[in-house]
């Protein structure tokens, strides 16, 4: 279930005006076939990302549904950076998130990723309760990156506390998005195979609270040191999490994450947004070749 973030800017043909998301996905699928790694998943923006504006047009909706069905893709949408239903603007935000969820349903997108805030679990649950569930579309709460806040949601204990509250409140269609760069930035050392295995075994221990069917990953290396609180992604084995394991990859924490993802068939997205299409495709070719070697 491996794939990548598909940016309209870097993947669509020049001059594209009406069906740019579909066009981007078509080019992305063709690229996967070209490098010998047929993609099973993808992540897109259907709104924003920095403004509360829907940016998928009517024609694009029709064609995107066909494209997703044709290639049997698992696609998730990333919410805008304003999608914070536990904020003071929650009435407007909740309405906008509801629009995004309905569009996801309409075009065959399986989930919407929202950034978790560094706030108490009860505030997050109260915000989620304002959103009406949309059948077949999961809201994935993404692990945040922070340094000083009490609630980082990078430890299994805090993840369990949050999802117990979610379950006990009766909320449906809520999942977890684990960003490896974020939990590293928040102070969790996942560089070695053994350190990652310890964290992931603890995650498996709470599968009764948050099942793997409701877990996805943002598979990113990080350009900053562990516990920095700074979110800066890097290509796999090019950042500070796993670069020291580039010549002994099966001893890396990344290898353990790939084992978990494969074992439980979780979607995993590489989030890369480089300067040009050529830079992006060069980086992704190397990364997916590495993943291919893991999966042999």
Swiss-Prot record:
It comes from the Viruses. Zn(2+) 1 binds at residues 78, 271. Binds 3 Zn(2+) ions. Its cofactor is Zn(2+). Disulfide bonds join 16-20. Its main location: host cell. This is Probable AP endonuclease. It comes from African swine fever virus (isolate Tick/Malawi/Lil 20-1/1983) (ASFV).
